[in-house]
Every structure is written in structure tokens, then in C-alpha cells.
Amino acid sequence: PYTTLFRSATMADGSKKTVTGYTCSPTTMAANTTAVTVSYSEGGVTKTTTTPVTVTSISNTLASNSWATIRAVSDAGKGSNYWSVGDTKGITINGKVGATTFSNLAISVFILGFNHNASREGSNRIHFQIGKINGTLVGLVDGNYGNSTSTTGAFTMNTSYTNSGGWNNSHMRKTVLGSNSTSATSPAANTLLAALPADLRAVMKPATKYSDNTGGGSDTASYVTSTTDLLPLLSEFEYHGARTYANSAEKNYQAQYDYYKAGNSRVHYKHNATGTAAYAWCRSVTSGYDYRFCRVGTDGGAGTGYAYFSWALAPCFF
């Protein structure tokens, strides 16, 4: 394992020489290895140097790895060498999310794709979605599910009858999810981001997402712009691989997630009633209407909903 690490020696006259025949100790590295010692002898002279190392043990079972290890693999762009789309890892959601309190909700996150749409969204990222419970795709719901409400912190896209401001300025993005937070380690209070485990938040990366960020009922290409997000909802195209109701220009900047491209079900179920299918919000504005956003139907198909109705949440992170 050291053949590419130690290849040259500095001679007495200051010249450098490519060498072979050196020895290394230990000969193989384990998780508890903290240093490597290299020795080289020539002309009766032996020189020894010790180099500190950090060894990370990586399991092919995603759930067996710490979030720090997953981040290290992600940074190296090697996630697909170890894990597969759809692999899961459990987390606990705990705290107040908008106007709803979650008390140690056990839920699994799963891999949507590796280096998804990297040229636009950022490279060396593993995209995850929240989540699954006992293998069932779920969305988080609140007590207002299926109803209109102006309550701040309800799981609505906005607190009034409008999609003005699009995804960027939505109540969902800022007040409920905290996706616009400057840092995952300093999340806005009472948001879903703040309710995620600290070890996960410590390694989360932002991504550049494209969406209609104007709204107002016009299918205008220039309305599709970028935002920097930590915990966004998926777009219509990221779910379905086709545009039905969203701004027709969104698809030019987006890609369908591999998990859904593979044919996996898009039907979400309520996190607190996993036998009941739920409508789930998308971040895409419904073009042609100034008061709707896209959503995934209880049959898994594309649909739309009034901005001030409460539906399920299933955001992603990176």
C-alpha cells in the first residue's frame, strides 16, 4: 500500500534519488494505525522517518459507518465504490419543527444518487432523502395535514394563497425546513434542519439547486434561478423525470434522481400512519397559477396543491 507514497531519498550531496528496497512498518494499516515508519539503507547507512497517518475503516454496509466516514468517502468522490442507490442509514429527528414537535422519531435516510447533476449542483456529494420507516417511503406530516392554514410553522409552502417568491422565499424553505441556513451547524431555530442529529449536521454540505424563484403564475424561463440549499424538497422533475406542471425551464437545469429513475415507488406514506398514503410537497412552483406548488400524489403521480395547505415533507440533503 506504500508504493506510491515513498519513492525518493535525499542523498548526502543534496541530490534526490528514486529508491526501492525500503521497508515500512507496519506492513498493512488498520483502523488503530496512527503512524508509518519507513527505513532505507545504502552504503552501510540506514535512515528512518516516521509519518503520522489517519486510517479510516469503511464498511460496505452504509448504516455501519459514522457520518464522518461517509463524509470522507463523499469528499473523495468514492461513494459508489462502497454503497448503492437506495442504501439506508438510521437517524433520529428530535425537536420542534415549525409548529410541530418530534420526540425522538426514528427514521432512515436513503441514497438518492451519487454526484447527482454535479456540474450544476456540486461535485463529491452523496444525495440522501428523508426518509423511510421499516422500509416504507414516508413524508413528515403535522396536525394540519390536508387542511388550509395560515399558521406560521405549519407544513405549508406559504401561509397565504400565493406562490409569489417561488421556492427561494417560501415559508417552507425558510421557516419549516431551514434549508436557507448559512451553516448546518448553526441552523435556524425550530426548523427541521435544527432537529437533525448533530453528527449528521456536522458533515452536511450545501448544494446549488435550480427552481422557479419568482412564481406569480407565469411560465417564464428567466424565473428559474439558483439557490444554495442544505435541506430542500425535491422538484417535480427530480421525482418524475418529466415536466407536467412546473415551470417548463426547470428541467433544463435539473436531473431525475437515480433512485426514482430506477422505477422505485414515489408514493409517500404518513410517518405516523405508514399504511396511509400522503400527498408530498415539491419545491417547484406550478406554472400558470399564482397560488399553487407541485406535489406528488397519493398514487405517486405528478400533481399540484394550494400553497397554504399542509402536505407531507420529504426533503433531501447532501
Question: Which residues fall in each region the model found?
Answer:
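Short, small-residue-biased leader/transition segments that mark boundaries at the very start
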Residues: 2-5
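Interdomain boundary/hinge segments at the C-termini of tandem beta-sandwich modules
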Residues: 51-57
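Serine/threonine-rich, repeat-prone extracellular segments and beta-strand-based repeat modules
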Residues: 15-47, 51
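Acidic, Ser/Thr
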Residues: 7-12
